[in-house]
């Protein structure tokens, strides 16, 4: 609203300059016209500019999984602002630029790249569309017209690993990881390190999957492998649902608040929530104060959230999480500090050293204790055709 009043004041000042200062003072001549009888007729017009429009580009369908929850965050943040938002979903990396063009033609001066899979393309495409301001979710480095917004879900994964191990009888934990999710490798490693705080020699079996059919096969394989607790870090909601069907204890990376009470095997869940960040972006856009900066979502600022433990968890699980949360928030959990070895036993980091955020984000290796069971992702032979339908 403040920006609207500023625009009205600016318009009034411009009118004063056009008519002369005297014409804006009380008692002087206004912009009145006379009708055929000579009676003065005052014409008063108020010009209001349209609110800014922000377009979102989603990699997956907004009807399910993490993308559905991210879309809900878009809508909830917009409810508290004057910003209009719209989106295109199911956009592949190759169609990303086409979606940018479509949203630009729709009047979007701001575009949210709402998946880390676009990060490798965003820099070059943003440089071709300097009239557009971009917000890259899952991006760590900003540039002239790109606001970088990333998060550290591995903080929550550390807690998930501890919870999984404490509730395991076999000391064998499974994790289904979607490589397209933010920092999938650090998430697996953090979960393994958390697990090892409970059982030093425990094993974390990792299976990679994305689509519903793939994650279902991954869960089945982990159960066959002897894993009695499974951590789900996937876009798909099918991972958690399959665990529930099999009666296997699990931890979800999706917000289960709406139906947690009906999930008999759920231990806890953790989520990455950009709602408050998006609201702050909307406000800056409305006030014309937006600049391309950087944001990192953590447990401390409420972007990364860890739920209370659920009834399926053992007694004492909540005590572990409650003791860990303050340390995660103040940075004293030291997840990736001290000696770290990879799966071959090679020392990657020495004692009294700590990985930087940049080192963590770019991890391509797994810590000792992680075994890769299989990659259940199938090659994509035919990319779906996107018609760039814009929805509100």
PLM segments and residue spans:
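C-terminal motif of bacterial Sec signal peptides marking the signal peptidase cleavage site
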Residues: 20-23
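Hydrophobic alpha-helical segments within soluble ligand-binding/sensing domains
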Residues: 149-172, 270-290
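Bacterial signal peptide processing site
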Residues: 25-28
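Periplasmic-binding protein-like
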Residues: 56-57, 108-116, 135-137, 225-236, ...
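Segments of small-molecule ligand-sensing domains
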Residues: 290-392
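Extracytoplasmic "Venus flytrap"
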Residues: 53-80, 86-93, 116, 180-185
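Flexible loop/hinge segments that line or gate small-molecule binding clefts
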Residues: 127-150, 256-265
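An alpha-beta-alpha
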Residues: 74, 159-202, 206, 294-314
